[in-house]
Amino acid sequence: MKKIAVLSLLFLCFYTIPSFSQSQGFGLGIILGEPTGVSAKYWTASNTALDFGLGYSFVKDSRFHLHADYLFHVNNLFETNENIALYYGPGARLRIVKNDDSRLGFRFDVGLVWVPKNTPIDVFFEIAPLLDIIPETAFSFNGGIGVRFFFN
């Protein structure tokens, strides 16, 4: 299972085409929180994107996380000169634990992203309520802050 997750992330990294701005193309960075790890974002249109995370949890049992979300961005929500957007969207999460307590479930990501002017980065804060459905129903949260670099 770990090999499939790693191969999927590598495929994503090498398959995407770099771009010149944060509203299109591919960005790669880090996220600190629950879990902590690698964050990737691929823009599918000017206001929608695919978001991926590959991380490790340091809380309770050590565990590996993989998530994917389809995000919708709401620009110009705040009256400011800065490029700040609200984003939200559904996704899925796989948590792999050493003692066979692995879980699969849904998540709903909500966050804010700031794109500094004339830079190839974005800075984000997000929280994601989780509803595990396999092997049993359980409710929890993920969240974190991060930064991504968008390739030219």
At which residue positions do the language-model features occur?
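Positively charged n-region of N-terminal signal peptides that target proteins for export
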Residues: 1-4
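N-terminal signal peptide c-region/cleavage motif recognized by signal peptidases
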Residues: 14-18
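Short glycine/proline- and aromatic-enriched beta-strand/turn motifs that initiate or cap beta-hairpins
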Residues: 20-58, 65, 150
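Short loop/turn motifs that connect adjacent beta-strands in outer-membrane beta-barrel proteins
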Residues: 20-25, 47, 75-84, 100, ...
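Residues that define the transmembrane beta-barrel architecture of outer-membrane proteins
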Residues: 24-26, 34-36, 48, 62-66, ...
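Residues on the lipid-exposed face of transmembrane beta-strands in outer-membrane beta-barrel proteins
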Residues: 30, 38-42, 54, 68-72, ...
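Sequence/structural signature of outer-membrane beta-barrel proteins
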Residues: 35-37, 55-61, 75-77, 93-99, ...
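Predominantly the C-terminal beta-signal and adjacent terminal strand-loop region
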Residues: 61-63, 117-152
